[in-house]
Swiss-Prot record:
InterPro entries: AceGlu_kinase-like_sf, Asp/Glu/Uridylate_kinase, G5K_ProB, Glu/AcGlu_kinase, Glu_5kinase, Glu_5kinase/COase_Synthase, Glutamate_5-kinase_CS, PUA. The lineage of its organism: Bacteria, Bacillati, Cyanobacteriota, Cyanophyceae, Synechococcales. Substrate binds at residues 54, 141, 153. It is found in: Cytoplasm. Keywords: Amino-acid biosynthesis, ATP-binding, Cytoplasm, Kinase, Nucleotide-binding, Proline biosynthesis, Transferase. GO terms for molecular function: ATP binding; glutamate 5-kinase activity; RNA binding. HAMAP family: ProB. ATP binds at residues 13, 173-174, 216-222. It comes from the Bacteria. The keyword Hydrolase does not apply. This is Glutamate 5-kinase. Belongs to the glutamate 5-kinase family.
Length: 375
C-alpha cells in the first residue's frame, strides 16, 4: 500500500492474553520485549505510536499470589493499583534500554464525555507526538466507576484511535486473525482476511466473548472496537500478539491478520466526539418521514417526527436515534429532557410553546449536533 510508506499515526492495543502467561498471570517478558522493539522500529520510521496496554489487574493478581481474577469492583481497583506500577516499570526498563522515552496516560470515560477534557486529552497526545514520546494508555481501573468504565481495552483503544485521528488500529490478540468461529474449538473454522466497511455492520461470527482467564476482552469486543474505529476513519487490524513484528510487514502491504476497511473520516472532530466519545442516555424513535428528512435532506430532527422515546435523559445529553424498525440511525445531542419531549412528540414546532408554557428550541436535535451512521 502506498499510504503505508508515509509516516502514520498508529494505535497498538495488546491484551492480557498476549502480555501474561495463562497459567500464572506473570508477564511474558519475551513478548513484551518483541513489542517494544517493534514499536521503536516504527518510531524510527517516522510513525507516531500510542500503545494501549492491558495487564494491570493480571499482573497485580500474580504479584499478590491470587489464582483468579477478582469479581468485586473495589478489590479489582486495589489490585490494578498494585499491577499498574509493575507493568509500567517493565515497559520503562525495556524502552529505556533502546533510549525511547515513554509516558503513562490513565483514562476514564469521563475524560471523553466532557468536551473540554476531550480536547485537553487530544492536545496532550499531540504534544507527546511532537516530543517523540510513546504514550502508554490504560483505563484508570483504580478510580473508574461502573457507569464510566470503557469495559474493556479494545473499546478504549478504538476511542483513543478516534481521539488522536489515527490511521491504523492494531488489536493484538491470542489468534492470528478473525475466524468464522473459534479455531481452537471448531475444526471447520475458516479465516476472514478482509472485512469491507459495508460488511462490518452485518458481520456475524461465533466468538468467545469471555476473553482469557486474566483479561476482560474477547473477539466480540474486538469486532465492536473495529466498528468504532473504522467509523472514525481508522483502518483496523486483528493480528497475533506474540508476533508484534508483523505490524511492520502489514504496513508494507503484507496480507496478514484480518483487516477492516475504514469509512471516510469526518473532518468534524466535534461530530466524532458526539458519535463515539459520549455515552448515550436514551433513545428516540422517529417515523419514516423524519428518517427521510435526516438522511436525504440533511435536516434537523423536529418534534413532529418523534414517535416514542426510551430512557431518562436531560437536555444536551447524547441519545441514540432509531428508525421505525428500531435500528440505530445515528446519535445526537438532544435539546429537551425526556419529560419535555414526551409532551411535545408528534407536534409541530409552533405548538411547542403552548404545551410547555415557554418557548423552547425549534429542533429536538439540531443537524450540527447530529451524526448519522454510514450506510
Amino acid at each position: 500500500m502506498t499510504m503505508a510508506m508515509q509516516p502514520q499515526t498508529l494505535v497498538i492495543k495488546i491484551g492480557t492474553s498476549s502480555l501474561a502467561r495463562p497459567e500464572t498471570g506473570q508477564l511474558a517478558l519475551s513478548t513484551i520485549a518483541a513489542l517494544v522493539e517493534t514499536v521503536c522500529k516504527l518510531i524510527g520510521q517516522g510513525h507516531r505510536v500510542v500503545l494501549v496496554s492491558s495487564g494491570a489487574i493480571g499482573v497485580g493478581c500474580s504479584r499478590l499470589g491470587l489464582t483468579e481474577r477478582p469479581k468485586k469492583m473495589a478489590l479489582k481497583q486495589a489490585i490494578a493499583a498494585v499491577g499498574q506500577g509493575r507493568l509500567m516499570r517493565t515497559y520503562d526498563d525495556l524502552f529505556s534500554s533502546l533510549r525511547q522515552p515513554i509516558a503513562q496516560i490513565l483514562l476514564t470515560r469521563r475524560e471523553l464525555i466532557e468536551r473540554t477534557a476531550y480536547v485537553n486529552a487530544y492536545n496532550t497526545f499531540q504534544a507527546l507526538f511532537e516530543l517523540g514520546v510513546i504514550a502508554i494508555v490504560n483505563e484508570n481501573d483504580t478510580v473508574a466507576i461502573d457507569e464510566l468504565k470503557f469495559g474493556d481495552n479494545d473499546t478504549l483503544s478504538a476511542l483513543v484511535a478516534s481521539l488522536v485521528e489515527a490511521d491504523w488500529l492494531f488489536l493484538l490478540t491470542d489468534v492470528d486473525r478473525l475466524y468464522s468461529s473459534d479455531p481452537r474449538l471448531d475444526p471447520d473454522a475458516y479465516p476472514i482476511p478482509l472485512v469491507k466497511a459495508a460488511e462490518l455492520a452485518q458481520l456475524q461470527v461465533r466468538t468467545d466473548s469471555t476473553g482469557s482467564a486474566w483479561g476482560t476482552g474477547g473477539m466480540a469486543t474486538k469486532i465492536t472496537a473495529a466498528r468504532i474505529a473504522t467509523g472514525s476513519g481508522v483502518r483496523t487490524v486483528i493480528t497475533h500478539g506474540q508476533k508484534p513484528e508483523q505490524i511492520l510487514a502489514i504496513l508494507q502491504g503484507a496480507n496478514l491478520g484480518t483487516q477492516f476497511e475504514a469509512q471516510p473520516r469526518s473532518d468534524n472532530a466535534r461530530k466524532r466526539w458526539i458519535a463515539y466519545g459520549l455515552v448515550p442516555t436514551g433513545k428516540i424513535f422517529i417515523d419514516a418521514g423524519a428518517v427521510q428528512a435526516l438522511k436525504a435532506r440533511g435536516k434537523s430532527l423536529l418534534a413532529i417526527g418523534v414517535v416514542a422515546l426510551e430512557g431518562e435523559f436531560s437536555a444536551t445529553d447524547a441519545v441514540i436515534i432509531c428508525d421505525p424498525q428500531g435500528q440505530e440511525l445515528g446519535r445526537g445531542l438532544v435539546n429537551y429532557n425526556c419529560n419535555e419531549l414526551e409532551k411535545i412528540k408528534g407536534l409541530h414546532s409552533e405548538a411547542i410553546a403552548a404545551v410547555l408554557g415557554y418557548v423552547g428550541p425549534d429542533t429536538v436535535i439540531h443537524r450540527d449536533n447530529l451524526v448519522l451512521q454510514e450506510n
